[in-house]
């Protein structure tokens, strides 16, 4: 029996129900992958191996350090998830009035627009999450971002030292990354569901997550560097001395310099965890969203 698909071309879904379902789906996904996300970020921005990173984190910061920046990350995922699916539902219907293209292309276009909107709206919390999760000092709950107080302190610190622009370092690269990734995710997801109708949402979501993540991982690495390199606490976030030296504003120029000084492999540091994270993240996101939409509509 074919499952109902609320993301299919022309599917009429109410924006409010999509916002609510997307927010809950985003939070559910975040709760499942928070420790993997922390480890992935540290591998991406550091120079140590996974075993050494995990061992050092637990020994010097405690097991709960795997959830550093979790509050900022949870808020980010709620905003991102609600905007993502709300925008997709609206765009999905609106595109039908503008152009009539094959379902896969339709979903890819809607996904690209969705990616830009959701990335821009949630970006300040993405910056906060990255900085909090990669800070390696042994600190209290209040300063690791697992509480409202710690999150507020970091917001205040960034605003005072870097201004409003501090919350948007790397936003252009992020929008390019997320736009391509989201377009690939929705395009692949709908392509799989159209070609193999019996495929369930979780399986299609997992496959689309792996493909989209692999394509865009180098952009994600560049974005993470842009997010932390202007911080006054950079030395506590990474042991990679090149990050503080590579201060080019252009993502392309920065990419060239990274490859020249550190090699192509650096752009893919942490991709194993990134892919491992993307499978449950995308699968849970789409599965929870689809099932909540069935309940709410």
From Swiss-Prot:
SUPFAM superfamilies hit by this protein: Mitochondrial carrier (SSF103506)
Biological processes, Gene Ontology terms: mitochondrial thiamine pyrophosphate transmembrane transport
Recorded topology in the membrane: Multi-pass membrane protein
One Pfam family per UniProt: Mito_carr
Solcar repeats: 13-94, 102-195, 196-295
Domain of life: Eukaryota
Keywords: Membrane, Mitochondrion, Mitochondrion inner membrane, Repeat, Transmembrane, Transmembrane helix, Transport
Major localization listed first in the record, in broad terms: mitochondrion
Transmembrane segments: 19-36, 75-91, 109-128, 163-187, 203-219, 270-287
A GO CC term attached to the entry: mitochondrial inner membrane
Record-level Gene Ontology MF annotations: thiamine pyrophosphate transmembrane transporter activity
Keyword presence, Repeat: yes
Signal peptide coordinates: none
Compartments, as annotated in UniProt: Mitochondrion inner membrane
InterPro entries, per the entry: Mit_carrier, Mitochondrial_sb/sol_carrier, Mt_carrier_dom_sf
Family classification: Belongs to the mitochondrial carrier (TC 2.A.29) family.
Biological role stated in the UniProt entry: Mitochondrial transporter that mediates uptake of thiamine pyrophosphate (ThPP) into mitochondria.
PANTHER family in alphabetical order: SOLUTE CARRIER FAMILY 25 (PTHR24089)
Protein name: Mitochondrial thiamine pyrophosphate carrier 1
Source organism: Vanderwaltozyma polyspora (strain ATCC 22028 / DSM 70294 / BCRC 21397 / CBS 2163 / NBRC 10782 / NRRL Y-8283 / UCD 57-17)
Gene that encodes it: TPC1
